[in-house]
């Protein structure tokens, strides 16, 4: 299974700039932050905020609080808008496994998978 989104906004921040509900995250100088159009209304739970998402094989930490329709990540460098982001699955040799994520938040992997809402488009691929 592969659960992906894409970068919808990318910005280089200044020291002290804040993002997210309640200005929960304060950026460092020169940090690249990106917005993804996925949030808890899509089933990407708020308690998954401590996870890393995968961008071209880089583990990118979620910053701030997962919002209703979006979340933000820190990037190691600038990436273009539209760059694919892997929430669950494999990306350039790195893997985000729902069972591993579930252990960190005190649940099971199936709860993460079953929580993905109907707002998220699905593509079914026959690998045979």
Q: Where are the predicted features?
A:
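Active-site anion/phosphate-binding pocket segments in diverse small-molecule metabolic enzymes
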Residues: 1-128
């Amino acid at each position: 299974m592969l659960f992906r989104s894409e970068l919808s906004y990318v910005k280089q921040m200044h020291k002290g700039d804040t993002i997210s509900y309640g200005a929960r995250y304060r950026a460092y100088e020169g940090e690249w932050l990106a917005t993804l159009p996925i949030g808890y209304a899509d089933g990407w739970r708020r308690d998954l905020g401590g996870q890393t998402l995968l961008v071209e094989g880089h583990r990118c930490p979620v910053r701030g609080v997962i919002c209703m329709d979006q979340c933000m990540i820190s990037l190691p460098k600038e990436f273009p808008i539209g760059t694919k982001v892997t929430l669950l699955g494999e990306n350039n040799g790195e893997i985000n496994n729902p069972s591993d994520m579930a252990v960190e938040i005190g649940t099971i992997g199936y709860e993460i998978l079953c929580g993905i809402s109907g707002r998220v488009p699905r593509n079914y691929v026959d690998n045979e």
